[in-house]
Structures are given as C-alpha cells and as structure tokens.
C-alpha cells in the first residue's frame, strides 16, 4: 500500500487516526512544536503534508490571525477535507502538491513545518532540498515526527501498542491496511541522530532536536543561512 492510497482511505477520519496512533497526545506534541517555533505577527509559514490544517490553525491562533499559512499536501482528499473543515478561515491557502516539487518561488516562507508527514515522503532528501529552497534566508525548518524510544521498558510497551494500532484501524475505518502501513513507516524512520545528519546534508545550519516522551516523538529544527 502506498501513502496516497492510505490517505484516500483515512482522510475524513485523519484527526481521529492521530488520536489512535498517539493516544491523544499529538495535541500536546503539536503545541510543543509551535512553542519552539516562536511564531511572530506577520510570519508566513508553509505547512507541508498539512492534512486537515491542524498545525496551521495552531500557528494562526498564536499570532491572533495576523499571519499567513499555506497548507500543502499531495493528497486531494486531504486538501478537500481540510478546506471543508476550515472554510471560514481566510488566512489559510490550500495547495495540492508533493513535498518533492513545491510550486513556490525561492525564499517564499519564514518557516517550513511538517508534522507526522516526513516519513511518508517519497524522497526525503529531495523534499528537504525543496524545504531549503522555499525558505527565506534565516528561515526555519521544523519537523515533528515519531522517532526512536530511548527508554527500554517504554520501548517494549510502545512496541506492543504499535501492534494493536491496526486492530483499532479496522474498527475506526473498517480497514487495517492503512494502519499497518503507517506503523511500518514509523519503524523504518531514521533515528534522531541519523535524521539530524540528513537535514544537515540539505545545507541546514544549527540543526538540533528535542525528544518528547522519551523519544516516542522528536522535534527537529534547522536554519537556512547564507
């Protein structure tokens, strides 16, 4: 099963899917991501693999609506669901495009955000190069993603829970295959240190990461410098 097939199936239950995969804690993790971003009035962000616009809404709330967000997602179903869900918000633009080929000019954005999306990119290196291209000088890349648990006992519990996720998926959307795919992408995603190096290979500077919940997820960030 490919990423686009998965999101065609789960689009109208995407937020519920995040609840299942994170036991509801994705809301706290996303707030931590926005905290670290330190949004400012007039900031322009691109929210890649933005799904239903959850991250963009959190960003706009922090700047009291005085900012601009572009939600970019390769999946038409996700974009249409996001538009419908946020039809009253005029500060969000919606664009259907893959992360590897963004339809924007160089140095267009102050920040590039991706939440639980990078592991589904077809080509992570190419997507990161695109992130670097569309960011302004001193622009910031910030990514929230499932990662490698650092605590042995917690890792065992997390492994057991991961095996249960497809069962929940069967109950919620009537199909366990999307959830098997998503748990597999989590297992195959690079470690925190390895992903840090991958980001650096796309010419980002001052790259660092923070673990949340002992590495169940990590937030990586880096800057575009001259």
How would you describe each model-predicted region?
Residues 100-112:
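A short acidic, Gly/Pro-enriched loop at the edge of an enzyme's catalytic core
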Residues 23-43, 58:
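Conserved alpha-helix/loop element of class I SAM-dependent methyltransferases that forms part
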Residues 1-15, 161-162, 172:
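N-terminal, positively charged/glycine-rich alpha-helical extensions of SAM-dependent methyltransferases
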Residues 14, 112-113:
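Hydrophobic beta-strand segment of the Class I
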Residues 44-101:
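Class I SAM-dependent methyltransferase SAM/SAH-binding core
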Residues 72, 144-198, 202, 208:
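C-terminal alpha-helical "lid/dimerization" subdomain adjacent to the S-adenosyl-L-methionine
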Residues 125-140:
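A short glycine-rich, Lys/Arg-flanked "PGG" loop and its adjoining helix->strand segment in the class I
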Residues 196, 202-226:
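Core SAM-dependent methyltransferase catalytic element
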């Amino acid at each position: 099963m490919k990423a686009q097939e998965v999101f065609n199936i789960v689009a109208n239950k995407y937020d519920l899917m995040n609840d299942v995969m994170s036991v509801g804690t994705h809301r706290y993790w996303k707030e931590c991501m926005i905290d670290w971003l330190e949004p400012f009035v007039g900031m322009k962000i691109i929210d890649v693999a933005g799904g239903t616009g959850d991250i963009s809404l959190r960003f706009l709330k922090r700047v009291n609506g005085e900012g601009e967000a572009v939600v970019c997602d390769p999946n038409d179903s996700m974009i249409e669901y996001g538009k419908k869900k946020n039809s009253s918000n005029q500060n969000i633009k919606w664009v259907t495009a893959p992360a590897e080929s963004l339809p924007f000019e160089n140095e267009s954005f102050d920040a590039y955000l991706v939440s639980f999306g990078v592991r589904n990119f077809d080509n992570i290196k190419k997507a990161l190069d695109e992130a670097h291209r569309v960011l302004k000088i001193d622009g910031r890349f910030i990514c929230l993603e499932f990662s490698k648990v650092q605590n042995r006992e917690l890792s065992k519990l997390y492994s057991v829970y991961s095996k249960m996720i497809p069962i929940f998926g069967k109950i919620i959307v009537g199909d366990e295959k999307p959830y098997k795919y998503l748990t597999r992408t989590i297992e195959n995603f690079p470690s925190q240190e390895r992903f840090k190096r991958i980001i650096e290979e796309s010419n980002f500077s001052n790259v660092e990461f923070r673990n949340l919940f002992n590495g169940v997820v990590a937030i990586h960030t880096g800057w575009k410098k001259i």
